[in-house]
Amino acid sequence: MMLRQYWNGVLRETEGSPEGPSYDLIVVGLGTAGAVAAITAARQGLRVLGLEQLPAMGGQGTLGYVMPYYFGGSGGLFEELDRKTREQTARGFAETNGLHPDCKLFVLEQEARKAGAELFFGAGLTGVYLEGKTVKGVQWLREGRLRSAGARVVLDCTGEAEVCVLSGCETRRGRESDGGCQPFSLPMTTYYQRKLCSQFVDSGFLEDPSPESYSRALVETMTGPMYLRDPFEPIDRVIAYSPRLGIREGRRIVGETDLRLKDLLDGKLPGPPLFYACANLDKHGSDYAMESLEMQEWCHIAKLWGVRLALPVPLGALIPKGYDGLLAAGRHLAVDHDLATAVRMKRDMQKCGEAAALAAAQAVARSCPLREVDVGRLRPKLAESGCLDLHPVFMKRIVSRDDGENPPVEWLTDPADIRAGLLSEEPGLALFSARRLGKEGAVLLRKWMGEDALRTPCTLGLGMLGFPEALPELRRLAFSPGEDFWAASSALCLLRWLGEKEDLPALEALAAKGGELRPYALTAARSIRSRISCEKTEDCHEMVAQPVD
C-alpha cells in the first residue's frame, strides 16, 4: 500500500498503511454535500468518519452565510433537515431570508451524532492511501498530530477535489479558451425589513486553487470598497461578513461519465440518473466571447439564460475515471465548464451527497466495485426519499424563485410555430428548435431567409447548424453592425467557428476600433488562426464546425 502526500507542493509516494481504525465510509469535507452524505450513510448503518477543516458542518449554508436557496430540485433528506432548521429558528432565533445558518449548523451536527457518525473538525487532509488505483484510506493533521484511518469507500466532498488530486485522478479547471472560472462572491449578512438577509456581489476571480491565491483574494475583497464603505448607509445595517469566499467553480474531476452541455442539448443523455440538478445556466459575468459555442448559442445568441433545465446526473459522474474506492460529491463532479454554471446549487449538492452515500452503502453491502453498483436497485431508494424525481420537467421558464410557479417550456416542432417564434422579440426557443431538427430545420431556415424580417434569425440559425452558406450574411451583420449589438456579437460568435482566413483582416480592423465588439472580434480571429494552423497538421477535427445532421 502506498501513501501519497504533497510536501511543499511536491508529490511524494512512500509505503505505508493507515494506523487508525477502519471505517465503511470516510467523508472528507462536511460542507453542503458532505454533511448530508455523512448523515445519510450513518442512517444506513455504515460506520462513518467525517473530516472537516473548518469548525462546523454545512459549508456555504452555515459558515458561508448563504441563507437562501437559488433553484435546485426539491425532495430528499435535506427537506427534513431544513424543516428541523425552521423549527429550531422558531424557538427564538432571528427570522432570515432563507435558513438561519446557526440553526442549520446545529441540526446537521445533532443528526450526524444521532445517526452515529464520528466527526473531526479542524482536520486538514494530508495524504491518501492507495493500492494501485483503489483508495484505501486517508491521513489528516489535527491539533499538530498526524492521524490516519482506513475505509472501504472514501467520499471526496472537498469542493476542490482534494482527495482526487492526491490520489492522482485527472481533473480540469475553468473553460477551455482561457481556463477562466466563474467569479466568486463574499457573502454578507445585513438586517433588512426585520430579517437577516444574505447579499452577494461578484467580487473577483480566483487565479488557481492554491492557498496563496485564496488568501490574496480574501484579503483584497475584504478590504475593498464594497466591504469597507465610507459611510455605510442605514439600509446596509451590516451584521457580518462571511469568513470564507463563495466559490462557484474550481477543479472538476474527469469521471467514468462526463456530462457536457453539447450532449444534453443534442439529446444525448447519459445513463439512468441518480438525481437531477435543476437550475438555469447561471453564468456570472458577461464575457460570452470567451465561452464555448454551446454556451454562446444558448445564453447569448438565443438568450435562454432564463430557462431552468433539469440536468440528469448519473453515477459515473461521481466516480473518478479509472479509480475505485473513491467517489466525488459536490460542485467538483464530472461536468464541463458550461454545466458547472448550473450543477452547483445548494439543494442539488445536498442531493448529490445523499446519492453518493447510498451508492457507497450498496458497494459496502455487496462488496463490489463502485462501477458495479446496481443503479436499478439504487434509484427506487432515491425516489422514495424524493432525492430522485422520476418525472422531471426538462425546461421551465423562470418567472419566480418558486420553481412550482414556473411554466414548462417545450421544443417547437410545427414549422408555423417556429416561424412565429423567429418573428417574435424572443426568437431563442425557435432558433434552438430549428437546430434540433437538423437538416429539416435548415430547409425551413433557407426557405424563410429571403424575408427581411426573418433574415437575421434565419442566418443565425443556419450558423448554429454549422452551414457555411450563412457566412455572407454573418459577415454583413458582424462588419456593418449599425446599432444592433446583439446581432453583430452573435454573428461574431458564429464566425469564431465558421469563419475563414479571408475574415482575418476585417476582424482585426474591428478589434482595433475597441468597444463592446472587440473581445468577440479578437476571439474569432484567434480561433480562425488556430484552425488554419491545425489544418496544416491535419489535426483539427475538433475545431472545425460541421453541419448538423
Q: What does each model-identified segment do?
A:
Residues 2-6, 12-16, 22, 40, ...:
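Conserved N-terminal/central alpha/beta ligand/cofactor-binding core
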Residues 17-31:
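Beta1/beta-strand and adjacent pyrophosphate-binding region of the FAD-binding site
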Residues 34:
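N-terminal Rossmann-fold NAD(P) dinucleotide-binding loop
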